[in-house]
Curated annotation (Swiss-Prot):
GO function terms (MF aspect): Delta14-sterol reductase activity; NADP binding
Assigned keywords, A-Z: Cholesterol biosynthesis, Cholesterol metabolism, Endoplasmic reticulum, Lipid biosynthesis, Lipid metabolism, Membrane, Microsome, NADP, Oxidoreductase, Steroid biosynthesis, Steroid metabolism, Sterol biosynthesis, Sterol metabolism, Transmembrane, Transmembrane helix
Organism: Mus musculus (Mouse)
Protein name: Delta(14)-sterol reductase TM7SF2
Cell compartment(s), UniProt: Endoplasmic reticulum membrane; Microsome membrane
One annotated Gene Ontology cellular component of this protein: receptor complex
Residues reported in the UniProt entry to bind NADP(+): K311, R315, L338, W343, N350, Y351, D390, C394, L395, Q396, K397, Y398, Y405
Amino acid sequence: MTSREASQAPLEFGGPLGVAALLILLPATMFHLLLAARSGPARLLALPAYLPGLEELWSPWALLLLFIWLGLQVALYLLPARKVAEGLELKDKSRLRYPINGFQALVLTALLMGLGVSVGLPLGALPGMLLPLAFATTLTSFIFSLLLYAKALVAPASALAPGGNSGNSMYDFFLGRELNPRLGSFDFKYFCELRPGLIGWVFINLALLMQEAELRGSPSLAMWLVNGFQLLYVGDALWYEESVLTTMDIIHDGFGFMLVFGDLAWVPFTYSLQAQFLLYHPQPLGLPMALLICLLKVIGYYIFRGANSQKNTFRKNPSDPSVAGLETIPTATGRQLLVSGWWGMVRHPNYLGDLIMALAWSLPCGLSHLLPYFYVLYFTALLVHREARDEQQCLQKYGRAWQEYCKRVPYRIIPYVY
């Protein structure tokens, strides 16, 4: 891919002006949510009562804790993996290799945390450090993204991402200029995608649960549900880690600030919003309502896992008895498009399951505040945007076959609605 070819790729997110705004708005939104969760009114759309000064945001101890956490996850990444998988073929016809040991990293981290707590590690004190930790992670994300951009300037043209080589420095810094930046066999994007932020989310939640137990004698039922639901989500992502190798993040998007900040900062500090809210604003939750919420979670997970497993099984072995009878549409690339089963219901059934699960882990926070539902609102917008990007990519890749698929499966995410 030449620079000229890349510069003709359509710009996303409003081009350079849009990404300039996002460079400010994304961190600002994250800090707004952190402050709103601990404020008395807990209003999503109101400005915080106060803005913390630098002395509240900056802490060398928070930076040290962040680096210890990242170092631990790097060490766990480098341990022998139960499996090494190959990614999709790159433009130079090569395939990169990836260790599949994310679930192992989650379990080992849990064991180390359990050992630490047993000898006096004050994990329950972590909620009081969320602001300086978020600040340290944001600062690290900017610096890391700059280093990645500098590295990409000397990368060969074949290593560049389709959309991050526009020629505009700010735009390319945000989207990511290099597709798979590596140091030896260590893949920065793959590591960040599912490790430090996703596992960090689980342990921030756990720290909030422990802090609630210290304050009120025991964790609330709502806090248990949020922790359990989100642990299942993270555990599923890491157990099926290999499936991330076919996602847009890995095969299409460069590794720039968008993914760096999203993976390292946005995920752990905003996805834990429900647990943060419950610590400062406890909500009553009866057993009947809890059971209904659990049922909703099970339905969402059933759709999410069923759709993803069906797709992954078909990709690996179309002759597998569980998918051999499904109807398909042939494409010019030689691949087949599923047009029955989960993928005949809507074009993105996994997104539907994702949204139902997001609603399920927000409902334990009650209906008195909009703030805990930020994730549902944000995730809906994210998936609609991602679905539009998917549609464009699939139309370019499959042409008439994709048009035929869209005729056969008219609904994108929600049956009979969208």
